[in-house]
Amino acid sequence: MIRVSGPDALAVADKVIVFRHGSCAAAQGYTLKYGTVEGVDDVLVSVFRAPHSYTGEDSVEISCHASPFIVERLMQLLTEAGAVPAEPGEFTRRAFANGKMDLSQAEAVADLIASSNEASHHAAIHQLRGGISTELQRLRSQLVDITSLMELELDFSEEEVEFADRNQLISLLDSALSHIRKLTDSFRLGNAIRRGVPVAIVGAANTGKSTLLNALLGEDRAIVSPVAGTTRDTVEEIFNIDGTAFRLIDTAGIRDTSDSVESIGIERTFEKLLLADSVIAVFDVNSPVEKLCSEFRSILSRVNLKSQQLIIVLNKADLLEGFEEARPSFASGTLSEDENASNRATLAVNKIVTEFNKIVSLTDNEVDTILLSAKSGFNLEILSQALSSHQKARIADAGTATLVTNARHFNALSTASRALSLARSGLLSHTPTDLVSQDIREALYHLGTITGEVSTEEVLGNIFRKFCIGK
């Protein structure tokens, strides 16, 4: 489909296409017209009249066969008739300029096109339909009311009239700050949905982290070797589970090393661990319990169990003595202590689980422990479901609340929050009203940059150049 938009769009179409009945220029909006481009193709043209079109301008959308030659020839003929090739995002930029959508909704168009799963699609649709815009309208309305009261007071300063009690203004600012905090707090989840939930796969060297990544992806993405320290940098891949994208991050094995390159990789492991929403801690179930406990304490000290999901994976189950005999009992899901265990594999696993539970109990939290074999695929599905269930619970907790998914919006909200905090401090310290009012106006400015009520050519250029041509 080729789109032409602008005041001369219908006239340009008439120069290129011979219609069976009448012309584009004489057609009403929301009309389909059949026509022929001589020697090129038969086409179907959708006619839209301003302001009832995507861009808010007169527009035509020409549906033709998808042959590269046909498309190229049509583009050439349209250009010769007076049209100009569109820049990336130009149609959406015109829609924004003509008031068909605000800037946050325009950005949602790009997110919608880029969405690769149900969760990111839902978030983009919510924003496109005005989710964040509605929240910001409420916020700006609150702040405008506060500013109006303060500036009215300034107009009557010589008469010493107080239009708003300071405690009342502080209460109003607290309400606005709380509103902004809810939005900024949603960014971690919103950004994860948009870009893929970050899942760090961490553990000591040679525990099978890269094999686990490859098994989850169903392809050999990371290099697997029996030599410890093979993975020296992070490897990231998107993995979809039940309509949600997860960004799996394979990391360098944690160990003491004199290799400077490997040391940098290990530092990056710790960085990714801090930023992950979920952490898969991988252990070789065949290692001595004391060694495993030491590795576990090291990882646990870097995980925030209040905000991060931790899944313990006891890998290489297929190498356990007596594994095949105990396999049915291990396939039931996450592990717990079994006081009646007699099988060697069960006893070995039970000992590890007991010691790990003692360590976890000191944190007043619970974690999932899964015995699996990344090599054979045993219990891989249980790991996938543990990730999926946790993410679904987070989304359910958010309910119908608006999620901030865009880093630009998050930064603007954070800056507005800082300005309002200064205004609040000013009211508490009896700072002159005009200075406090200036802080609130600054907050309004930054909120306005999100929807485009305040914008610069540089900001608009940065946003729309990321679009594909045709949108």
Where are the model-predicted features located?
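A glycine-rich (often HGG/GG-containing) alpha/beta subdomain
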Residues: M1-H122, H126, G130, V303-K306, ...
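Terminal RNA-binding accessory module
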Residues: L213, E237-I238, T244-R247, F270, ...
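Switch I (G2) and immediately adjacent beta-strands of P-loop GTPase domains
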Residues: T36-G39, V45-F48, T230-T257
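Inter-motif core of Ras-like GTPase G domains
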Residues: I264-N286
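Conserved nucleotide-binding/hydrolysis micro-motifs of P-loop NTPases
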Residues: G6-A9, A50-S53, S67-F69, M101-D102, ...
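C-terminal-of-GTPase-core extension/linker across diverse P-loop GTPases
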Residues: H121-N240, T257, L275, N286-K471
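Short, conserved glycine- and acidic-residue-centered signature motifs
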Residues: E262-G265, V436
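Generic enzyme active-site microenvironment
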Residues: L248, V282, V313
